Structures are given as C-alpha cells and as structure tokens.
Design a protein with these regions (language model features):
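Conserved His + Asp/Glu catalytic blocks
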Residues: 1-169
Length: 172
C-alpha cells in the first residue's frame, strides 16, 4: 500500500508491504514518479524504514535541496543546522546552543519548507502515481496478411504475415 501524507511538509509518502519484494516494487514505483535534479541520477529524499506488526513500513520525504538559506547566510540569520534525515523525521539537531535559543516553530517550519519539494512537484508525483492509461480495444482478426498502423510512433503502415506456421512482423 502506498499513501500520501500531508501533515508535516510536502512530498511525504508512506508505504506498507508484507514482503521485501513488494516494498521494493512500491518504493521504486514511487521513485520513478519523482524528478531527479539536473545532473543527478535520482531524486533527493530521506528514507525511514522499519518493521512493525508483520509488515515493512517506510516513510519517504522528497527534498528539493540539502540545506536552507540559513546555513549559507552570514550574521544573525545564519544557522549551522542543516536539516538531515533525523530533522526531516521531526527530531531537530541543533549543534550550537545560541542557535537553539533563537529557534521557534515558525523558523523550523520555514527551514523544512525550504528543503522540501513544492506543492506543484508533489502534485506531479501524485498525478504520475494515479493517472490511468487509455484502454486499447483490439478486435480479433484472421487473415494470411494483416496491414495496420500504430499512429503514435509515426512509422507508417506495418505488416504481419502468416508464413510456414509462424507470424512474421515487419519482415522478421
């Protein structure tokens, strides 16, 4: 089972499966629906996985980047916090005591929002997961030779021929 969770930030999905194989299939199906940043092979994400009540469970949090602007800022806006996996799971690690004193729920929310994917990107993932393909209806045909065209590939007329008990398609 694959679920979308919208209670923490954008881009959070939860999967549940009874077997490792099912969990892997769901995970890769979800990953295939997300865009990878330019120059990268896969999307940015944090993954939390565990076993509970006889099933594998995973929480996937898609990200747009590794760090918020606060990490790169100078002066009072600077924070050494860099939301990692624990932070994206709700446990914020603050390495500098003075920064801890400056934190507020609004600031943490801003940091998480900055590194999370946008609502538009989340919508694209959901659309790719839930879209349906048009149904193809083909009647049963019988003849020694059938000529047809697949409109979407633009290759023109194709031919299937029955020869010596075998079907020959485009000469092969």
């Amino acid at each position: 089972h694959l679920y979308h969770y919208d209670g923490f930030t954008t881009g959070v999905f939860v999967l549940r499966a009874e077997t490792v194989k099912s969990a892997a299939k769901l995970f890769y199906r979800l990953l295939d629906c997300a865009d990878a940043p330019e120059g990268e092979k896969e999307p940015l994400f944090n993954l939390f996985s565990y076993w509970k009540d006889g099933e594998f469970r995973s929480v996937i949090v898609f990200r747009s980047r590794h760090r918020s602007h606060h990490y790169f800022s100078e002066g009072p806006d600077h924070l050494t916090m860099s939301p990692g996996c624990a932070d994206m799971g709700g446990v914020f690690i603050v390495p500098v005591e003075e920064e801890y004193e400056r934190l507020s729920p609004e600031l943490l929310e801003e940091m998480v929002r900055e590194v999370s994917i946008t609502e538009e990107e989340e919508g694209m993932i959901i659309n790719r997961l839930t879209r349906t393909q048009p149904r193809l209806h083909v009647g049963i045909m019988s003849a020694k030779e059938i000529e047809f065209e697949i409109l979407s590939d633009g290759a023109g007329a194709r031919k299937a021929v029955m020869r010596e008990g075998k079907i020959e398609y485009d000469g092969a």
